[in-house]
Amino acid sequence: MADMSVKQLADLVRTTPERLLEQLKEAGVAITHVDQTISDEEKRKLLLHLKTSHSTETDKKRSKIVLKRKKLSVVKSGKKSVNVEIRSKRTYTKPVVEQKRETEPAPTQEVPPTSDTTNLNEKAEVNVATLEKAVEAEVKEEAKKTPSEKKETPKKGPRKETRRSRKPDKEDKWEREELHMTKLVEERRRRHKPAHMPDSDSASAKLEQGFARPTAPVVREVALPESITVADLAQKMSVKAAEVIKAMMKLGAMVTINQRIDQETAAIVVEEMGHKPKLIKEDVLEENLVATLGEQTGEAVPRAPVVTIMGHVDHGKTSLLDYIRRTKVTSTEAGGITQHIGAYHVETELGMITFLDTPGHEAFTAMRARGAKCTDIVVLVVAADDGVMPQTVEAIQHARAAKVPVVVAVNKIDKPEADPERIKTELSTHDVLPEEWGGDTMFQPISAKTGEGIDALLERILLQAEVLELKAVDNGPARGMVVESRLDRGRGPVATVLVTSGELHLGDILLVGREYGRVRAMIGDDGRPCESAGPSMPVEVLGLSGTSVAGEEAIVVPDERKAREIARFRQGKYREVRLAKKQTAHLERIFDRMGEGKQNTLNIVLKADVQGSLEALTEALNKLSTDEVKVNIIASGVGGITESDVNLAIASDAVVIGFNVRADAPTRVLVEREGVDLRYYSIIYDLIDEVKKALSGLLAPEFEEKIVGLAEVRDVFRSSKIGAIAGCMVVEGVVRRHLPIRVLRDNVVIYEGQLESLRRYKEDVAEVRQGTECGIGVKNYNDVKVGDQIEVYEKTQVHRTIA
């Protein structure tokens, strides 16, 4: 604290400089003038003097009151009696209040230089006043008590005396806090208090709770995991679960208190109820692992480019790869079309290139997207005689989404009807411009049959790779992507992994999505086992715990325990999210099904050879569902058809479909014995067409009405047996017996029924043709009048198909 003058200090403590000089003199501080400065040491000396003088004056003003009490009582136990005498002594200090002098014009308020002295004075005054009140109340209580009231049982006497002896301590504790009460409230409370409770209202007032009901709604920030139950969501918002259920009913969703909802639905509910959602991810363990493995030490070296061949079906993608590899891969594909991704590492005269061959069928959209995700260059194959097709446009969109350069290969130029210039024009409408037109896309005419232009295509691919400057670290823990996975009967789960960085060795712990395992064997694209694989190398890995999802990232983990922990965590999270989405979809359709009739369902057990084909088939079959019929895939998997699949089909009345897989001998015996519908397919076209036919058979029959003839009523006769007989003239078509009819009056249908009798000249006939008179009897209808028209029609069933 900086030094200040006596005058400044007097202004600060709000007293006169003369009074402050007197106090300084009494404290022994040698200051005689108001303009002299006072140091911190002199201030502390003054404060100590004021505290000492104040306590001395207070002690002089106090006097002591000693209260003695003696109680006699008798305790009887049977014939004996014991006299009990209880003595108590209590001492109180009573302050003497001095009268203020009238001679002083105005009282001066002495304020010590620090806040410590002020608090000490206030606490001393409160303590003295409280003790004075306690003494007065105790004296009044002693005067009011009668001898009969003083007699107490010996058991209660000491207990009450002990309580009363503790009261001054309690009051002292309460007096440590300041009391904020108006005088009116204090007087009103004192009037209703009994006399034996001395000044307890001040103590109870200090113990009052300070809670006040909020006037404005409380807005909370609610942390939402990827799935949460309705009860937990209500607890996070501090509301009842019934309110959350009510809010979701307003949004059109029926939920229960223990039902799980996904993160997006929970965020909408939180916003609807006036709070702020905060989306959190429960994958901290995964992020930490990726962060630790993300720092790969080592120098980046050039690597081979990963080239994905895309295009429409039957445009020659696999044939182009055949010519480059000098093999016949197309002959191994059913129907000559690619139905899964093939990864091949090709060593050409110009350099190393890794090729990915993707399917062109529309059902394999997800597989093409995966191919574009892990590639460096996309070779777009377009047939010169066919032009740009839907899957060609889709491949362009995948390449743009992945921000990958495109090299266009115009195939089949050896055909007479080939027109490469038309291909350039059609691709230019999709913003794919050749270099000679001022664009940045390289075009190369080729023929996968004769080999024309293929060397030039490889040169363009490697030129594009040099421009991209592709590099990767070739040592350390490996990272890659699962291109395809399948379940081999003899070797177990097999995953085709494309290494992107690092080096994969035998014995490494590999973590792939929800699966993990030790690499027991690695097989190259040429079918030979290998010890290690570097960047841009595709290998088949054996040893995983299950068939992994294609497109997942593969990471080498140093610890098997950590890999197992992360895999189980991912499995639990995937199960919760899938269950939440399934329940949400089920509840969204509940109201739609209430007003509709029974929906016919075709249950299917689907088995495929690889994971990618299974995904494509599942998506394609689910798209066939309509409002009337539905495809329900109750089970799907990778690998051969087993007895458990057949038993599941028996229990659910399902059709077993195998795509490029077969059933073993015991399973075939079970199929024949139980009569299960088992079908094998190797081409996706045939599978989808057969399922369409099966769904068409489940459609409700549709009937079409065809007007056969029209007769005009000329006269009406009455018959005792039949009733009214209409004499008619057939004016159009043929009138046949036992066909449904309509009676029209003024071109308005007034009755629909059955033609009961048809006569001509009193003879029953089967039909009457145009221009012939006849008598017609309508079943259960006698109100036929002249001028009416009788329309005869028949219903024919129309064959319905799935579009």
Curated annotation (Swiss-Prot):
It comes from Coxiella burnetii (strain RSA 493 / Nine Mile phase I). Residues 311-318 are annotated as: G1. GO terms for biological process: translational initiation. One of the essential components for the initiation of protein synthesis. Protects formylmethionyl-tRNA from spontaneous hydrolysis and promotes its binding to the 30S ribosomal subunits. Also involved in the hydrolysis of GTP during the formation of the 70S ribosomal complex. It comes from the Bacteria. Keywords: Cytoplasm, GTP-binding, Initiation factor, Nucleotide-binding, Protein biosynthesis. Belongs to the TRAFAC class translation factor GTPase superfamily. Classic translation factor GTPase family. IF-2 subfamily. Coiled coil: none annotated. This is Translation initiation factor IF-2. It is found in: Cytoplasm. Residues 336-340 are annotated as: G2. One of its GO terms (molecular function) is GTP binding.
